[in-house]
Protein backbone atom coordinates (compact mmCIF):
# COMPACT_ATOMS: atom_id res chain seq x y z
CA UNK A 1 0.00 0.00 0.00
CA UNK A 2 0.99 3.67 -0.22
CA UNK A 3 3.81 4.75 2.08
CA UNK A 4 1.90 6.71 4.69
CA UNK A 5 4.97 8.31 6.32
CA UNK A 6 7.14 10.17 3.82
CA UNK A 7 9.97 12.63 4.26
CA UNK A 8 9.98 15.23 1.47
CA UNK A 9 13.43 16.82 0.87
CA UNK A 10 11.80 19.31 -1.51
CA UNK A 11 9.43 20.59 1.18
CA UNK A 12 11.84 19.82 4.06
CA UNK A 13 8.75 18.35 5.68
CA UNK A 14 7.29 15.11 6.98
CA UNK A 15 4.24 14.23 4.92
CA UNK A 16 1.66 11.99 6.61
CA UNK A 17 -1.40 10.23 5.25
CA UNK A 18 -4.19 11.67 7.40
CA UNK A 19 -5.75 8.59 8.97
CA UNK A 20 -8.71 10.53 10.37
CA UNK A 21 -10.37 10.49 6.96
CA UNK A 22 -9.71 6.92 5.86
CA UNK A 23 -11.19 4.99 4.18
CA UNK A 24 -13.44 7.51 2.45
CA UNK A 25 -10.69 9.85 1.29
CA UNK A 26 -6.90 10.09 1.25
CA UNK A 27 -5.65 13.46 2.48
CA UNK A 28 -2.07 14.38 3.32
CA UNK A 29 -0.83 16.40 6.29
CA UNK A 30 2.45 18.35 6.03
CA UNK A 31 4.57 18.72 9.17
CA UNK A 32 7.18 21.47 9.09
CA UNK A 33 7.27 22.59 12.72
CA UNK A 34 7.17 21.18 16.23
CA UNK A 35 3.55 22.24 16.61
CA UNK A 36 2.65 20.43 13.37
CA UNK A 37 4.19 17.22 14.72
CA UNK A 38 2.44 17.58 18.08
CA UNK A 39 -0.90 18.24 16.38
CA UNK A 40 -0.47 15.20 14.12
CA UNK A 41 0.18 13.03 17.16
CA UNK A 42 -2.56 14.43 19.41
CA UNK A 43 -5.43 14.45 16.89
CA UNK A 44 -4.27 11.10 15.46
CA UNK A 45 -3.36 12.08 11.94
CA UNK A 46 -0.84 9.33 12.66
CA UNK A 47 -1.33 6.67 15.34
CA UNK A 48 0.03 3.31 16.37
CA UNK A 49 3.06 3.08 18.64
CA UNK A 50 5.75 2.33 16.04
CA UNK A 51 4.40 4.96 13.62
CA UNK A 52 4.32 7.47 16.47
CA UNK A 53 7.98 6.68 17.19
CA UNK A 54 9.02 7.16 13.56
CA UNK A 55 7.06 10.42 13.37
CA UNK A 56 8.67 11.67 16.58
CA UNK A 57 12.14 10.89 15.23
CA UNK A 58 11.55 13.06 12.17
CA UNK A 59 9.88 15.60 14.46
CA UNK A 60 13.12 16.07 16.38
CA UNK A 61 14.86 16.97 13.12
CA UNK A 62 12.10 19.46 12.25
CA UNK A 63 12.31 20.88 15.78
CA UNK A 64 15.98 21.55 15.15
CA UNK A 65 15.35 23.24 11.81
CA UNK A 66 12.71 25.41 13.46
CA UNK A 67 15.16 27.02 15.93
CA UNK A 68 17.73 27.98 13.29
CA UNK A 69 18.68 31.61 13.81
CA UNK A 70 17.71 31.63 17.49
CA UNK A 71 20.35 33.14 19.77
CA UNK A 72 19.61 30.50 22.39
CA UNK A 73 18.83 27.62 20.06
CA UNK A 74 19.84 24.90 22.50
CA UNK A 75 17.27 25.99 25.11
CA UNK A 76 14.59 26.44 22.45
CA UNK A 77 15.35 23.03 21.02
CA UNK A 78 15.09 21.37 24.44
CA UNK A 79 11.62 22.88 24.84
CA UNK A 80 10.57 21.61 21.42
CA UNK A 81 11.80 18.10 22.14
CA UNK A 82 9.90 18.06 25.44
CA UNK A 83 6.73 19.13 23.60
CA UNK A 84 7.05 16.20 21.25
CA UNK A 85 7.88 13.70 24.00
CA UNK A 86 4.82 14.75 26.01
CA UNK A 87 2.35 14.81 23.11
CA UNK A 88 0.86 11.43 24.09
CA UNK A 89 1.53 9.61 27.37
CA UNK A 90 1.02 5.90 26.74
CA UNK A 91 3.04 4.79 23.69
CA UNK A 92 6.60 4.13 24.85
CA UNK A 93 7.95 4.42 21.28
CA UNK A 94 7.38 8.18 21.40
CA UNK A 95 9.53 8.54 24.48
CA UNK A 96 12.11 6.14 23.06
CA UNK A 97 12.51 8.09 19.81
CA UNK A 98 12.94 11.48 21.49
CA UNK A 99 15.36 10.08 24.06
CA UNK A 100 17.34 8.42 21.28
CA UNK A 101 17.77 11.82 19.62
CA UNK A 102 18.69 13.42 22.95
CA UNK A 103 21.30 10.70 23.46
CA UNK A 104 22.78 11.37 20.02
CA UNK A 105 22.91 15.10 20.79
CA UNK A 106 24.69 14.50 24.08
CA UNK A 107 27.24 12.19 22.46
CA UNK A 108 27.84 14.51 19.50
CA UNK A 109 29.40 17.13 21.76
CA UNK A 110 29.86 20.71 20.60
CA UNK A 111 28.36 20.47 17.11
CA UNK A 112 26.58 23.17 15.16
CA UNK A 113 22.81 23.08 14.74
CA UNK A 114 23.16 22.25 11.05
CA UNK A 115 25.46 19.34 11.87
CA UNK A 116 23.08 18.08 14.55
CA UNK A 117 20.09 18.26 12.22
CA UNK A 118 21.97 16.31 9.55
CA UNK A 119 22.83 13.60 12.09
CA UNK A 120 19.22 13.49 13.31
CA UNK A 121 17.73 13.25 9.83
CA UNK A 122 20.04 10.34 9.01
CA UNK A 123 19.02 8.58 12.24
CA UNK A 124 15.30 9.22 11.63
CA UNK A 125 15.59 7.60 8.21
CA UNK A 126 17.36 4.62 9.79
CA UNK A 127 14.59 4.24 12.39
CA UNK A 128 12.04 4.40 9.56
CA UNK A 129 13.71 1.61 7.57
CA UNK A 130 14.49 -0.46 10.67
CA UNK A 131 10.85 -0.42 11.73
CA UNK A 132 9.74 -2.00 8.46
CA UNK A 133 12.42 -4.68 8.77
CA UNK A 134 11.40 -5.41 12.37
CA UNK A 135 7.77 -5.78 11.36
CA UNK A 136 8.71 -8.20 8.58
CA UNK A 137 10.64 -10.29 11.12
CA UNK A 138 7.68 -10.19 13.51
CA UNK A 139 5.56 -11.42 10.62
CA UNK A 140 7.92 -14.32 9.97
CA UNK A 141 7.95 -15.50 13.60
CA UNK A 142 4.25 -14.88 14.12
CA UNK A 143 3.22 -16.42 10.83
CA UNK A 144 4.74 -19.70 11.98
CA UNK A 145 2.27 -19.72 14.90
CA UNK A 146 -0.73 -19.47 12.59
CA UNK A 147 -2.27 -22.56 11.02
CA UNK A 148 -3.62 -22.97 7.52
CA UNK A 149 -7.31 -22.12 7.58
CA UNK A 150 -7.16 -19.98 10.74
CA UNK A 151 -9.49 -17.06 11.28
CA UNK A 152 -7.56 -14.49 13.28
CA UNK A 153 -9.31 -11.87 15.39
CA UNK A 154 -7.56 -8.54 15.91
CA UNK A 155 -8.46 -5.38 17.79
CA UNK A 156 -7.75 -1.80 16.69
CA UNK A 157 -5.21 -1.40 13.86
CA UNK A 158 -1.72 -2.80 14.27
CA UNK A 159 -0.97 -2.91 10.58
CA UNK A 160 1.08 -1.00 8.05
CA UNK A 161 -0.75 2.19 9.03
CA UNK A 162 0.31 1.80 12.68
CA UNK A 163 3.96 1.25 11.84
CA UNK A 164 6.40 2.41 9.19
CA UNK A 165 4.98 -0.39 7.04
CA UNK A 166 3.89 -4.08 7.02
CA UNK A 167 2.55 -4.02 10.58
CA UNK A 168 2.87 -5.96 13.82
CA UNK A 169 -0.39 -7.87 14.38
CA UNK A 170 -1.25 -7.56 10.69
CA UNK A 171 2.40 -8.32 9.96
CA UNK A 172 1.69 -11.73 11.51
CA UNK A 173 -1.26 -12.12 9.15
CA UNK A 174 0.87 -11.07 6.18
CA UNK A 175 3.64 -13.40 7.36
CA UNK A 176 1.23 -16.33 7.39
CA UNK A 177 0.05 -15.45 3.89
CA UNK A 178 3.65 -15.16 2.68
CA UNK A 179 4.22 -18.67 4.09
CA UNK A 180 1.45 -19.98 1.84
CA UNK A 181 -1.26 -20.27 4.48
CA UNK A 182 -4.86 -19.37 3.80
CA UNK A 183 -6.02 -17.21 6.69
CA UNK A 184 -8.79 -14.69 7.20
CA UNK A 185 -9.28 -11.88 9.69
CA UNK A 186 -12.06 -10.64 11.94
CA UNK A 187 -11.43 -6.95 12.59
CA UNK A 188 -13.17 -5.63 15.69
CA UNK A 189 -14.57 -2.21 14.83
CA UNK A 190 -12.84 -0.63 17.86
CA UNK A 191 -14.99 2.18 19.19
CA UNK A 192 -14.81 5.10 19.43
CA UNK A 193 -12.18 5.90 16.74
CA UNK A 194 -13.11 2.82 14.68
CA UNK A 195 -9.54 1.89 13.78
CA UNK A 196 -10.58 -1.69 13.05
CA UNK A 197 -13.52 -0.85 10.82
CA UNK A 198 -11.81 2.04 9.06
CA UNK A 199 -8.11 1.13 8.96
CA UNK A 200 -7.61 -2.61 9.44
CA UNK A 201 -10.37 -3.43 6.98
CA UNK A 202 -9.01 -0.78 4.58
CA UNK A 203 -5.49 -2.16 4.36
CA UNK A 204 -6.38 -5.86 4.39
CA UNK A 205 -9.04 -5.37 1.71
CA UNK A 206 -6.50 -3.52 -0.45
CA UNK A 207 -4.08 -6.42 0.00
CA UNK A 208 -6.69 -9.00 -0.96
CA UNK A 209 -6.68 -10.68 2.46
CA UNK A 210 -10.19 -11.84 3.50
CA UNK A 211 -11.53 -9.64 6.30
CA UNK A 212 -14.86 -9.21 8.07
CA UNK A 213 -15.64 -6.37 10.48
CA UNK A 214 -17.37 -7.25 13.75
CA UNK A 215 -19.02 -5.03 16.31
CA UNK A 216 -16.94 -4.95 19.48
CA UNK A 217 -19.76 -6.53 21.46
CA UNK A 218 -19.93 -9.54 19.12
CA UNK A 219 -16.61 -11.06 20.24
CA UNK A 220 -18.05 -13.53 22.73
CA UNK A 221 -20.61 -14.93 20.31
CA UNK A 222 -18.06 -15.27 17.49
CA UNK A 223 -15.70 -17.16 19.78
CA UNK A 224 -18.47 -19.36 21.17
CA UNK A 225 -19.48 -20.32 17.63
CA UNK A 226 -15.92 -21.46 16.90
CA UNK A 227 -15.34 -18.74 14.33
CA UNK A 228 -12.03 -17.58 15.87
CA UNK A 229 -8.89 -19.74 16.10
CA UNK A 230 -6.31 -17.15 17.16
CA UNK A 231 -6.27 -13.59 18.50
CA UNK A 232 -3.34 -11.32 17.59
CA UNK A 233 -3.10 -7.70 18.73
CA UNK A 234 -0.42 -5.02 18.85
CA UNK A 235 0.73 -3.03 21.86
CA UNK A 236 1.57 0.55 22.71
CA UNK A 237 3.68 -0.62 25.60
CA UNK A 238 4.74 -3.96 27.08
CA UNK A 239 5.93 -3.67 30.67
CA UNK A 240 8.74 -5.50 32.47
CA UNK A 241 6.41 -8.28 33.65
CA UNK A 242 4.86 -8.86 30.21
CA UNK A 243 1.61 -6.95 30.68
CA UNK A 244 0.53 -5.42 27.36
CA UNK A 245 -1.07 -1.99 27.17
CA UNK A 246 -3.10 -1.72 23.98
CA UNK A 247 -6.23 -0.07 22.61
CA UNK A 248 -9.16 0.05 25.01
CA UNK A 249 -11.15 -3.17 24.81
CA UNK A 250 -8.14 -5.43 24.32
CA UNK A 251 -8.35 -6.65 27.93
CA UNK A 252 -11.92 -7.79 27.40
CA UNK A 253 -10.99 -9.64 24.22
CA UNK A 254 -8.17 -11.40 26.10
CA UNK A 255 -10.53 -12.48 28.87
CA UNK A 256 -12.93 -13.93 26.31
CA UNK A 257 -10.10 -15.72 24.52
CA UNK A 258 -9.14 -17.42 27.78
CA UNK A 259 -12.76 -18.40 28.43
CA UNK A 260 -12.96 -20.14 25.05
CA UNK A 261 -9.43 -21.59 25.00
CA UNK A 262 -8.20 -19.43 22.12
CA UNK A 263 -4.49 -18.46 22.03
CA UNK A 264 -4.04 -14.70 22.53
CA UNK A 265 -0.82 -13.23 21.12
CA UNK A 266 0.73 -9.77 21.33
CA UNK A 267 2.93 -8.62 18.43
CA UNK A 268 5.35 -5.78 19.14
CA UNK A 269 8.94 -4.75 18.36
CA UNK A 270 11.47 -4.89 21.17
CA UNK A 271 11.54 -1.11 21.51
CA UNK A 272 7.87 -1.21 22.53
CA UNK A 273 8.92 -3.21 25.60
CA UNK A 274 9.56 -0.92 28.57
CA UNK A 275 11.77 -2.67 31.15
CA UNK A 276 11.66 0.44 33.36
CA UNK A 277 7.92 0.14 34.06
CA UNK A 278 7.05 -2.81 36.35
CA UNK A 279 3.44 -3.58 35.37
CA UNK A 280 0.62 -2.45 33.13
CA UNK A 281 -1.06 -0.76 36.08
CA UNK A 282 1.93 1.60 36.28
CA UNK A 283 1.43 2.95 32.75
CA UNK A 284 -0.32 6.33 32.35
CA UNK A 285 -3.55 5.77 30.43
CA UNK A 286 -4.51 8.54 28.03
CA UNK A 287 -7.97 10.03 28.62
CA UNK A 288 -9.04 11.55 25.32
CA UNK A 289 -11.57 14.19 24.34
CA UNK A 290 -15.23 13.31 25.09
CA UNK A 291 -16.33 14.30 21.59
CA UNK A 292 -14.83 11.09 20.18
CA UNK A 293 -17.54 9.24 22.13
CA UNK A 294 -20.38 11.75 22.00
CA UNK A 295 -20.10 12.31 18.24
CA UNK A 296 -19.76 10.23 15.10
CA UNK A 297 -18.24 12.63 12.63
CA UNK A 298 -20.16 15.86 13.06
CA UNK A 299 -23.26 14.14 14.43
CA UNK A 300 -23.94 14.05 18.17
CA UNK A 301 -25.18 10.64 19.35
CA UNK A 302 -25.50 11.30 23.10
CA UNK A 303 -27.69 13.86 24.88
CA UNK A 304 -26.12 17.24 25.66
CA UNK A 305 -24.61 17.30 29.13
CA UNK A 306 -24.10 13.54 29.51
CA UNK A 307 -20.58 12.68 30.65
CA UNK A 308 -18.58 9.86 29.07
CA UNK A 309 -15.48 7.73 29.62
CA UNK A 310 -12.87 7.83 26.85
CA UNK A 311 -9.82 5.98 28.10
CA UNK A 312 -7.72 5.17 25.05
CA UNK A 313 -5.93 2.06 26.37
CA UNK A 314 -6.16 -0.76 28.89
CA UNK A 315 -3.53 -3.14 30.30
CA UNK A 316 -3.90 -6.85 29.57
CA UNK A 317 -2.33 -8.97 32.34
CA UNK A 318 0.49 -11.26 31.26
CA UNK A 319 -1.29 -14.43 32.37
CA UNK A 320 -3.75 -13.97 29.49
CA UNK A 321 -0.99 -13.79 26.86
CA UNK A 322 0.18 -16.98 25.11
CA UNK A 323 3.23 -15.30 23.60
CA UNK A 324 4.77 -11.93 22.78
CA UNK A 325 5.93 -11.94 19.16
CA UNK A 326 8.98 -9.72 18.56
CA UNK A 327 11.53 -9.36 15.77
CA UNK A 328 13.91 -11.41 17.94
CA UNK A 329 11.52 -14.32 18.35
CA UNK A 330 8.52 -15.28 20.49
CA UNK A 331 8.71 -14.61 24.22
CA UNK A 332 6.95 -17.14 26.45
CA UNK A 333 6.04 -17.10 30.15
CA UNK A 334 7.41 -16.41 32.66
CA UNK A 335 7.71 -13.02 30.99
CA UNK A 336 9.72 -11.22 33.66
CA UNK A 337 12.60 -13.64 33.10
CA UNK A 338 12.13 -13.72 29.31
CA UNK A 339 12.17 -9.93 29.02
CA UNK A 340 15.17 -9.59 31.31
CA UNK A 341 17.10 -12.10 29.21
CA UNK A 342 16.04 -10.38 25.99
CA UNK A 343 17.59 -7.10 27.10
CA UNK A 344 20.69 -8.79 28.50
CA UNK A 345 21.28 -10.53 25.16
CA UNK A 346 20.64 -7.41 23.07
Curated annotation (Swiss-Prot):
The record marks 156 as: Transition state stabilizer. GO terms for biological process: L-methionine salvage from methylthioadenosine. Signal peptide: none annotated. InterPro entries: IF-2B-related (IPR000649), IF-M1Pi (IPR005251), IF_2B-like_C (IPR042529), Initiation_fac_2B_a/b/d (IPR011559), M1Pi_N (IPR027363), NagB/RpiA_transferase-like (IPR037171). The active site is at 236 (proton donor). It comes from the Bacteria. It is an enzyme of class 5 (isomerase). Its EC number is 5.3.1.23. One of its GO terms (molecular function) is S-methyl-5-thioribose-1-phosphate isomerase activity. Substrate binds at residues 47-49, 88, 195, 246-247. Pathway: Amino-acid biosynthesis; L-methionine biosynthesis via salvage pathway; L-methionine from S-methyl-5-thio-alpha-D-ribose 1-phosphate: step 1/6. It catalyses: 5-(methylsulfanyl)-alpha-D-ribose 1-phosphate = 5-(methylsulfanyl)-D-ribulose 1-phosphate. The keyword Plastid does not apply. It holds the Pfam family IF-2B. NCBIfam families: eIF-2B_rel, PRK05720.1, salvage_mtnA. Belongs to the eIF-2B alpha/beta/delta subunits family. MtnA subfamily. This is Methylthioribose-1-phosphate isomerase. It comes from Maridesulfovibrio salexigens (strain ATCC 14822 / DSM 2638 / NCIMB 8403 / VKM B-1763). The lineage of its organism: Bacteria, Pseudomonadati, Thermodesulfobacteriota, Desulfovibrionia, Desulfovibrionales.
